Amino acid sequence: MNVSYGVYVSPSAAAGTLPTTYLQLHKTSGTNQQSVLNFTNLTIARTQCTLNTDAVVPFGDVTPSQTSSGDGIKVQSSLGVNCTNEAGAPTAISYSVTQKTQAGDKYTLPMTLMAGGGIVGDIRGFLGANAATDAGCATNASSVPMDSTKVGLRSISGNESWSEPLVWVLCPKATAEPGRATAAASIDVYW
């Protein structure tokens, strides 16, 4: 006899712990009942992923010549992903970037003065094999959406760890006032 079971989790379910799971099979013949199988504390195979990237991206001091070049100020980084897939079933892994400070457009995160809040430039991200080539102050194929759009990374069928090249670019505005500036965003991984 082969027995299999599954657990369905609604996509809208809140995160939480898995309950203790039991499986019992009974065989009945007339009034005669027998316990055939009794499993307690079944383990539900699941996928879990963690994300590793720089928490702070320092662009340094911006000079007037950097505001007119149009290339932006580039900082090399990486997006590291570590996933365990206990079930072995194909699982799509994706990510999203959500702006935590003033909203920009789909592909930009405004950098604002810490005193006064004026916008001094836009930050762009570029992810993947072409990130270094694409990185600049224009949208390209490897551009990172900054509007919470989920973007696929890859599909996994087992335990996998990998790192994707990530380039952050600050595109300073020629009209920016001098001073310290900041921007914040969160990167989330989904499976």
For each of these PLM feature ranges, what is it?
Residues N41, A184-Y190:
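Short, low-complexity, Pro/Ser/Thr/Gly-rich segments in the mature regions of secreted, periplasmic
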Residues A13-Y22, D71-S78, S161-E164, T175-A184:
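Short, solvent-exposed loop/turn segments enriched in Ser/Thr/Gly
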Residues S69-A141:
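Surface-exposed interaction patch
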Residues N2-P11, W162-A174:
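Short edge beta-strand/strand-turn motifs with a hydrophobic/aromatic core
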Residues V56-G70:
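Beta-sheet-dominated interaction scaffolds and their linkers
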Residues M1-Q48, P64-S65:
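N-terminal export/ancillary region detector
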Residues Q48-P58:
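Proline-enriched interdomain boundary motifs that mark the N-terminal boundary
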Residues S68, M114, L153-S161:
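Short proline/glycine- and polar residue-rich coil/turn motifs
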